[in-house]
């Protein structure tokens, strides 16, 4: 059956037929592919994880479509070496095999860091959501992103209340471009210092007391959190651009509180 199939006339390539609307497409490709990758780990050299991957290229106005299967073929080609130091090469391959001028690669993945409880010194793994966003046109561009959970305690509530203050878990999202390599662990540590207290996956009673009291002595609005992150990121000479967001999932309000700052070294 296979031999008979191969004898048939070659199949037409519909994607390469001309499109008469003359409208170019900025991004077209495949989205949400689950695939294993390797991430550099500060303490253990590397870490294996699973990423959700998006791959896009541009499409000239005269082509009807792109070749979707080639994106997955490229992933399989680099299946043993999908890592940060290979992203530019993968993007270059995408441009070559898909006849594109621009290529984009996005990855979101869980990254685990061993954390030590502040008093008991109990160790546990903490999960963080990280992103790699890379593109290649005339030059290579890369953005590292991390979502860092922290605790925030409201300064206004502390000032007004006779008994404690409302506090909640918050998510700080930071994205950076850099001129020299930055460890994920170092960026996490910097951002965790911007809330009222870090978050831990394992706390004993003595740790809970310490963390609760630390947050109470260090109240922060979302405004404080993004400003503090800005001060710390601007002090890092290898950071050329960054954006930082803070979202408090308010414990006594129906809404969330939000703040964001974006800066580049040039500005």
UniProtKB/Swiss-Prot annotation:
**For the site May be catalytically important, which positions are given?**
154
**What biological-process terms (Gene Ontology) are attached?**
tetrahydrofolate biosynthetic process
Keywords, A to Z, come to: Hydrolase
E.C. designation(s): 3.5.4.16
- InterPro entries given in the database record: GTP_cyclohydrolase_FolE2 (IPR022838), GTP_cyclohydrolase_FolE2/MptA (IPR003801)
Q: HAMAP family given for it?
A: GTP_cyclohydrol_B
| Family according to the record | Belongs to the GTP cyclohydrolase IV family.
- Stated name of the protein: GTP cyclohydrolase FolE2
* Organism encoding this protein: Citrifermentans bemidjiense (strain ATCC BAA-1014 / DSM 16622 / JCM 12645 / Bem)
Taxon lineage: Bacteria, Pseudomonadati, Thermodesulfobacteriota, Desulfuromonadia, Geobacterales
Q: Give the gene symbol.
A: folE2
């Amino acid at each position: 059956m296979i031999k008979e199939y191969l004898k048939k006339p070659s199949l037409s390539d519909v994607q390469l037929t001309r499109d008469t609307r003359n409208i170019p497409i900025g991004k077209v490709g495949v989205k949400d592919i689950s695939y294993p990758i390797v991430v550099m780990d500060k303490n253990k050299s590397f870490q294996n994880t699973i990423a959700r991957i998006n791959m896009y290229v541009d499409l000239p106005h005269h082509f009807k479509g792109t070749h979707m299967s080639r994106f997955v073929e490229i992933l399989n080609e680099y299946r043993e070496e999908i890592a940060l130091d290979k992203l530019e090469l993968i993007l270059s391959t995408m441009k070559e095999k898909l006849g594109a001028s621009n290529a984009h690669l996005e990855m979101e993945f869980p990254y685990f860091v061993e954390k030590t409880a502040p008093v008991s010194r109990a160790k546990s793994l903490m999960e963080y959501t990280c992103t790699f966003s890379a593109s290649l046109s005339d030059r290579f561009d890369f953005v590292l992103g991390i979502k860092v959970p922290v605790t925030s305690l409201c300064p206004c509530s502390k000032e007004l209340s006779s008994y404690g203050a409302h506090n909640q878990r918050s998510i700080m999202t930071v994205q950076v471009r850099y001129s020299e390599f930055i460890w994920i662990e170092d960026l996490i540590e910097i951002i965790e210092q911007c809330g009222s207290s870090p978050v831990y996956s394992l706390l004993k009673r003595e740790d809970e007391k310490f963390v609760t009291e630390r947050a109470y002595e260090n109240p922060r609005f979302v405004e404080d959190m993004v400003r503090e992150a800005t001060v710390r990121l601007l002090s890092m000479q290898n950071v050329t651009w960054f954006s930082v967001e803070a979202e408090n999932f308010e414990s006594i309000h129906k809404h969330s509180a939000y703040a964001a700052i974006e800066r580049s070294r040039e500005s």
